[in-house]
């Protein structure tokens, strides 16, 4: 089969290819084809990838998007609209207004989504007309884009992925000396806004043991996370990104007094690409880039879509009854049973009201943002910004929106 990787010049590409090499003994991969608008970066990365792959499968480059996806069974989206300069704006502009600046959350996520939507719309339309491939999406904001594609573009073969769930599973597996597949989580929410209510290892409910372990860890490093009373009260393990919502003042101070993460990543990528020119193994510096277990999440999902083994993956897809007290059409990050090309949601009962309060609020923001893009409406864009829990005051909203639109004028125009 052919796998197309869109955003082939990404610094993550070698790790992704390593994941594909790992599964190539279980499923037949004939060729992996790369497409990126940055041809120079892509050439450096793909030359390195060829040294990694040797002759295990063909490694190709396409100079058009359509050429990459036309015969593909799977298409992986890992492109970054606007590049790291776009991310720098997403992180920097909100800080001027006293708001959290983060690439996927709040105002930064709003800006990133507006840049991504027109490109995603064009790409999905091309895939629909050519290969009808399954699209595995890592492009941020991943859950918001999945909501856009599944519920507005109505392309069903689109699965949003993130590395946060698999890292949760890995940490719990290590805690109990278990395998990844021995761990099951009652896990639900949105991408970067998710909650764990129950933890099972080999069928045993170990939730209380996990909470005790977590509180012991926190008592030794009290400034690094939520206070122990938070877990006693809320009784949920929360996605690390909830810090932006629940520790907003502390996180704003941290972000506003440190170098922007986008600029840090620019420096890391410069080092990485120099290494990639001659490397034959994945450089240790890639660990500084973030995205731990990204390749495992993507490659294992493709492997299990291709086989009949029936494994559980946490992905972004429609609720379809997984959480009883949330609408079926909400795109959520939830555990699913993956087998023979299909993703089936698992019934998890009702969600906790504390978690649901965040999920409903941010889902409505997501939908307002999508509608603002589709209708090219500044009025709806202002409603979206004001509706977000991390959004601006009324006094700042119009100026903030104009600055975001000016920074992204090459990608989107609203009237």
Swiss-Prot record:
Its EC number is 3.2.1.86. NAD(+) binds at residues 1-64. Pfam families: Glyco_hydro_4, Glyco_hydro_4C. One of its GO terms (biological process) is carbohydrate metabolic process. It catalyses: 6-phospho-beta-D-glucosyl-(1->4)-D-glucose + H2O = D-glucose 6-phosphate + D-glucose. Mn(2+) binds at residues 162, 192. It comes from the Bacteria. Gene3D superfamilies: Lactate dehydrogenase/glycoside hydrolase, family 4, C-terminal, NAD(P)-binding Rossmann-like Domain. Substrate binds at residues 87, 140, 163, 261. Optimum pH is 8.0. Active from pH 6.5 to 10. Its cofactor is NAD(+); Mn(2+). Is a retaining glucosidase as it hydrolyzes glycosidic bond with retention of anomeric configuration. Reaction mechanism includes redox steps involving NAD and stabilization of intermediates by Mn(2+). This is 6-phospho-beta-glucosidase BglT. It comes from Thermotoga maritima (strain ATCC 43589 / DSM 3109 / JCM 10099 / NBRC 100826 / MSB8). The gene is bglT.
